[in-house]
Amino acid sequence: MFAEGQIQKVPILGKESIHIGYKMQDHIVSEIVANIKSSTYILVTDTNIEDLGYVESLKTKFEAAFAKDGIKSRLLTYTVAPGETSKSRATKAAIEDWMLSKGCTRDTVILAVGGGVIGDMIGYVAATFMRGVRFVQIPTTLLAMVDSSIGGKTAIDTPLGKNLVGAFWQPVNIFIDTSFLETLPVREFINGMAEVIKTAAFYDAEEFTRLESASEIFLSTIKKRDAKDPRRVDLSPITDTIGRIVLGSARIKAAVVSADEREGGLRNLLNFGHSIGHAYEAILTPYILHGECVAIGMVKEAELSRYLGILSPVAVARLAKCIKAYELPVSLDDATVKARSHGKKCPVDDLLRIMGVDKKNDGSTKKIVILSAIGKTHEQKASSVADKDIRFVLSEEVIVGEAPVGDKKSYTVTPPGSKSISNRAFVLTALGKGPCKLRNLLHSDDTQHMLEAIELLGGASFEWEADGETLLVTGNGGKLTAPAQELYLGNAGTASRFLTTAATLVQKGDKDHVILTGNKRMQERPIGPLVDALRSNGADIAFQNAEGSLPLKIEAGVGLKGGLIEVAATVSSQYVSSLLMCAPYAQTPVTLSLVGGKPISQFYIDMTIAMMADFGVVVTKDETKEHTYHIPQGVYTNPEEYVVESDASSATYPLAYAAMTGHTVTVPNIGSKSLQGDARFAIDVLKAMGCTVEQTATSTTVTGVPNLKAIAVDMEPMTDAFLTACVVAAVSEGTTVITGIANQRVKECNRIEAMRVQLAKYGVVCRELEDGIEVDGISRSDLKTPVSVHSYDDHRVAMSFSLLSSIMAAPVAIEERRCVEKTWPGWWDVLSGVFNVPLEGVTLAKTVSKAESGLSKPSIFIVGMRGAGKTHLGAQAANHLGYEFIDLDQLLEKDLDTTIPQLIADKGWDHFRAEELRLLKQCLNDKSEGYVISCGGGVVETPAARDALQTFKGVGGIVLHVHRPVSRILEYLNKDQSRPAFVDDLEAVWQRRKELYRSVSSNVFFAPHCDSAEATAKVQQMLGAFLDRVTGKSEFVIPHKDQFTSFLSLTFPDVSIAATMLPSLSEGCSALELRVDLLNENDEAIPSEEYVLSQLAILRQNVDLPILYTVRTKAQGGRFPDDKPVELANLVNLGLKTAVELLDVELTYPAELVSSVGASRGYTKLLGSHHDFPGALNWSSLEWENMYARAEAVPVDVVKLVGMAKSFSDNFALENFREAHTSSPLLAINMGSHGQLSRVTNTLLTPVTHADLPVAAAPGQLSVEEINQTRSTIGMFNKNLSFFIVGTPIGHSKSPILHNTMFKKLGLPYEYSRFKTDDAAAVNAKARALLAQGNLGGISVTIPLKQDIIPFLDEVSPLAQQIGAVNTIIPGPNGTLKGDNTDILGLVNALTRFGANSLDKKTALIVGAGGTSLAAVHGLRSLGFAKILIANRTLSKAEAIADKFDNVEAVTLDSFVANKYTPSVIVSCVPATTFSMLDESNKLVSAALAASPKGLVLEAAYSAEATPLLKQVMDVEGWEFISGLYMLTEQGFEQFRLWTGIPAPKEVGEKAVLGN
């Protein structure tokens, strides 16, 4: 900085008006008073600056100066709220109105004391007040000092973007007092560094280099706060740095502004990073600061320069590394950005729209500052860039078009440095002593993680040279110390393995241990064998989460003993390389023995040994023992220079491009002398497939051929290249067999499975082998075009499929395109810029469901205790889904030709478990789709079986835990003597297995005890509904806010006490909320999972409504303990496992729980909730904004925000909030009596209560009836809506009493009437007239108009079209009429209610062939009847209907008897009055009743009288008669729902029609 009182002056626009100094408040005041005279000075600042005492200090100094010189001026002060939201029209207007009220005139001088927001806005006030008054900039933040205060650009923000309304208005002076920085918060300091880095990046390469090396001391200084006053910091260690960057940036900006004040071209350069950065800021403000958005914008604009072929990949990597070094974000995926913005999305279309109103643009052409090198721009102005190129850089996915066809060309491509060699070089130089210049390093995410970790461990210092092409590493000879923070390695598998061993050499430092961790996928990847080897040699390592994977806790100061170390090398050669490189630093020489068979990827082991020799340590191979190495003690000596080969794995992509397109491609720096096994790819794979290959010691050239041929190849020396080989094999003649690649199952993903699944999308058939894959090549013309290719966040998957997609005639979308940055950040630039393959950025619609698996019909593996019902329910499940059922125990007995008891008696339990595991794995592999497989109860006792089931679950398979009351299971098992006896006590077995079932299962189905056929049928119905939810066949649809939906909040401690009341309690509700936290099981604070499952089952048994599953914590007004996160997670996940329709997720749940629920929701919809019980928030507070954004970030399907009203006006504030937040469905209400109006005006899933509940779930809750009556009173319902029935005769129709009773029950102000007519045109005329007035509610259609009305309708549902009849008319959008048919549902529900699902469904009989009979056929088919018979007096009519369907047959009495049919259901579609006159029908029904021992007879005619058919059935034992009135009410309930959007109150409706 500067000595106190020392002032540096910088000229701008011909005047030395920029004054820079330290503690210069006296200078500021004296300069203003002496040289900028005025009657009124106005000091405008924000509350943060005011709270720090600066305003009072300046005020005192001004008043002293006025008094001293006898000046009769006044100083007024005005304070605004801090933050970007204050930079608005409203704030500007408020300041101007206040100034006018204070009598300010043209001579007023405004002093802007604050950051960029204050400077920009107050400058604009000065520019417009009285047509312009003088103002002075006094910046207090680093960002304002180096950027926004200089140049006279003033502005405010608008909803469409930042700084769009403003003026050029130069300040009289800019006083930069760096002492203000001593109270600058850490985040604001870092925020300001973005502008410093920006200036250096486009203008000053030397300063950029200085910034690269200064981050560590800069950050450590600004973070070291004064213990007595944490707001203050001692900046003395970086005095010179701050002085230099402030003065340097001010000079650069002043020079540019002086040359181009009005932004004609040159001044645009100051906007590097801002074109895209401002677009991000417009969306992310106020969560993400200006500098943070500019940091992301700089990286994106640099990537754009690279994509256009102007900027080198090294320069982009340097810029990103420098930005990250100052803890600024480089992408939206930055964890801090996600956390602060609550994961708010920045849609590319929105970003481009915002960029479209940038001031630099030339009409519709966007202009962006393009770098050509660090410190240089492509042009001396912003350059014109096409939208498609910007879109590509901003997009997360890419559409790959067809490569140019025609003349064959030659290309030369140099891939980035080898990741394998780069990472080894980092470890060796860090463990080595002295300086070493590393050239051609890979700049990637992986190597960046390695570099950052080595720096944190103190292993080496790094300095970039030659524009970032060379890295000077100065190693510390293996002296590593434990850092304060954990080492985060992302998904960098190589870094994790190499650093695991290196971390054992660490001495105690800031901590006495080292934590190695990574992202979610990294925490699934194996590292167990390496840890086992290190532990056996004395290292103290603990798994922090899952056994065998990161995160690891490694104790410091322990080291390695040396001597013999054994490691399994059949999974990863990196375990071996890790041990080899660190072995010289063990306490004694090391003998490394590789056990378990032939090592995988021997080439990489040889590479490590060769590189160790280059650094002075020679490894010798044992001459007698296979796979054994001797490593001496020592310290590596760093060579002066080490050149990293290009990555041979990456080189396979351009070479394969040549093979597939017929072009010629040369990779100039990889040849036969390469250290890397993948260098053999061209010879061993492409040449064998028919390509022309020329390979020298240092280069490789491939020319493709029209007809590639399949090969068999062992790719063990080059396993990473197998993915490239697969896509070439896909268009080769014959079947390619690739082996030796078992390790590829445990890379970034299971790559063998990934290639099989994704190639299938192209129509290419693959088969997985134990250590490889078979690929059936097909003709290019037979390739199918996938909707999209899933990359699994795996760089090699993405790059491989980009090649296959480039030879497709139709474009292909590839997801997660950025994953290539792991090894080749510029791959897409090569594909587009070198090979001219058309690329287009795209944002694909994301559906949150099961993990990408390629399993269209995932099999269901059932686990659970013996006696839980696995076989019985499994067979039912298979029947319901149309899958094949297998009992694993029975299959095993058949396979081994023995019984399980005999097998155990002969060979013991261990042998049985081994055979069971073998068969399980076989089924998981061969029967992964279309099966329901019941496993033995003890399968989970075998760890490998659990692993296999969990793996299957992880790729989208279903592992279903079937359970029933434990007491019933134990009771059954104690009686069962047919199976092997348990070794342990049954209760102990259950307690042991309970957790194991939970760990492997994706879902759980609880079957309650059944004591009747009806109860058994209900459980079967529950199972079918459950399976439909799990498989996505039935998915809850979030209602539209215009539908007036609600849910009943159940508050019973045990819902069984209200089981029979549930239908009446829930009348008019769209869902039931089970408050799990309110359940009381034996006065325990937390109910058991079995108790919760039993409660859910009671709800499912008694009400067919969706369930909202809620575990409300005490902090959010519930009863669940806040200090039980594990138990909370278990209960929340139980809701997901039962596939509830809706799950409440408190937005204040632990972040990892919210994240896991969001990722594993299946088809469950999420309701993200926050409740302000204390009433601390008002609806204009930022906290509600944050909660809304946090909910969208999960993302949830419904946002639920609940405030506490303190006055009636809080309801209007809530409605303003609702109106402003429409991007996600919003349930927003106020609690308390003052807030009851909000429950009326909220129309989406309003929580309601009922008079018969023990208590209301929240203060102020109302019933459905109360809410609807109020809505009616205040005009939310249209009282003039008309509902009626049409047809003739309708005088005795029960529909009016049905609907009017239901309207009244729910407090709806409607009337249902009759319109007698047989003229469809008259119905249409009346309906259209009512539609025009907005007064049509709905119409029931009966005979004779069900067919006649169809031509008059605008739309007819598919079901009604199939039947050819409409019984319901619904008003549609834009004055349309839609026809539907609810008769089918009426018929199905009536039969189901009386137990149709428990009957034998071989045959059903329909009597009559009129319009209703078509509905009957559809209904019976949907119930699962295998054969349907139809009889009619006129046989041809029955035959006409039968001909429309499979398995429907027209019968006569004679054919019925002759075929000995045994129907279990009879449906009469003959009018009740004519049935007795039909002698044939009478006889046929009599024959059917006699043919079966039991069944149901449904009379489809709506008659309340005792009909002839009823009398006929009453005399037959085992048969039950169902009145047509049940069908009437059931179809009417569906009509009611279609018209109102509200479920019908069935109990009162039915009672009105049927009586008691």
Curated annotation (Swiss-Prot):
Bridged cysteine pairs (disulfide): none
One family name in Pfam for this protein: EPSP_synthase
Lineage top rank: taxon: Eukaryota
Annotated GO biological process: amino acid biosynthetic process; aromatic amino acid family biosynthetic process; chorismate biosynthetic process
UniProt: NAD(+) binding residues: 46-48, 84-87, 115-117, 120, 140-141, 162, 180-183, 191
Region (3-dehydroquinase): 1050-1266
Residues that, per the record, bind Zn(2+): 195, 274, 290
Region listing for Shikimate kinase, in residue ranges: 858-1049
Residue span of region 3-dehydroquinate synthase: 1-387
Pathway: Metabolic intermediate biosynthesis; chorismate biosynthesis; chorismate from D-erythrose 4-phosphate and phosphoenolpyruvate: step 2/7; Metabolic intermediate biosynthesis; chorismate biosynthesis; chorismate from D-erythrose 4-phosphate and phosphoenolpyruvate: step 3/7; Metabolic intermediate biosynthesis; chorismate biosynthesis; chorismate from D-erythrose 4-phosphate and phosphoenolpyruvate: step 4/7; Metabolic intermediate biosynthesis; chorismate biosynthesis; chorismate from D-erythrose 4-phosphate and phosphoenolpyruvate: step 5/7
Name assigned to this protein: Pentafunctional AROM polypeptide
Organism the protein comes from: Yarrowia lipolytica (strain CLIB 122 / E 150) (Yeast)
Lineage: Eukaryota, Fungi, Dikarya, Ascomycota, Saccharomycotina
Name of the coding gene: ARO1
